[in-house]
Amino acid sequence: MGNTIVIANTNIYKLPFPFLPVTITRFADGEIRPFIECDVVGKKVIYVASMYPVPSDIILEWILTIDAVKRKGAASITAVVPYMPYIRQSKVHREGESRSAEIVSRILSTSGVDKIMTFDLHNESALSFFTVPVVHLSALVSLPSLVSCDAKTIVVSPDQGSAPRAKRASELLHAPFVVLMKKRSLVAGDTVEELDLHDDIAGKTAIIVDDIISTGTTIAKAVTLLKDHGCRKVIVYAVHAILSGNAKETLESTSIDQLIVTDTIVHTTDAYPEKTKVISVAPLLSNALQQNLA
């Protein structure tokens, strides 16, 4: 591993490799200019790129940075994208829309990277869009060490699309799972119109498992529904905390007992809702990198 270095804007995850920063400057008209000052000739480069908060800008920054690294003579480039944007747009729901997940995946694949690492894609079928190897990691494996389960614990999927993820979590926790029914507006994609539940959950501890919290509306309605049906406690575990708009206030307005998220997206402490616990994906990432770069 002595021939491996990490480059990034900031050293968020404190990985067990030498870290060297990327310098990003902008011209007066806003054009991006990355600069790689360090020596990368013949080295295995790990490029850690957060795609938050403006993924459209950061994707261009990614492309230019990868090109700069290749031009300096790196032996290989492994790109780490803890949260992969645009994957929610994996289908064309209405004529006139783009299949954005496929387009972005192809752009990233052809940027010059040799491998991509990411966590908990919203839709695993999007893996087929990439044309370079993708190491798809899951932060769900940390769940058993974070929550205590008993005979009255259930795992809840907030919608049908998240059911496979909730099922994996239920297997890890050795607990049954239920699925909430959800309808979403095609016009305002983040707006949940209704939820329904067909299981008896009175007196249970519910653990809602999802990959993303964006506006918080889905989770807030799910928490309220579960409490209205008699759940004694509701814990939410979500990998990617986007927390857009009024998500903090929306979640704080519910009777949620605990929110657990990871640092695939990093916020300041005051940006998180009350009762939030943030866990780091650094150990999982470090282990995966050492295995894949060996």
Residue ranges and their predicted role:
Residues 1-294:
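PRPP-associated nucleotide enzymes
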